[in-house]
Amino acid sequence: MAKDGGAADPLRNPRFQEPSVWQLFRESLFGKPRLLDCIQVEVTSVCPGRCVYCPHTTQAGYWRSRHMEAATFARLWPLMQESGRVHLQGWGEPFLHPRFMDFAALARKAGCRVSTTTCGLRMD
């Protein structure tokens, strides 16, 4: 029980609940649950497609295609450590980013599952 009467104090916080035996058992097997279920990261806005619904097409005069810098992705490390999954996608084709596999490896190193969405146009 917290000495300062904070959120962990059941006498001062009616929403406080002691962890159940099941919760303690599950945490002993799998670790504490992560704060975030998933974070989605747009690693690139570069795409060869011209889909009618996409900003590449609908906002062609304003759209800037570019890759995320590796240093920017690295700054997401604290969030990745609190997330169960990192989804690498966005309005671009993620496999066109030259560091895609490095980004996926960093997310795995943080303990995340990694997923992506691709149009598959450049899978050669």
Regions found by a protein language model. Give the residues of each.
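Conserved alpha-helical substructure of the radical SAM core
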Residues: 6-124
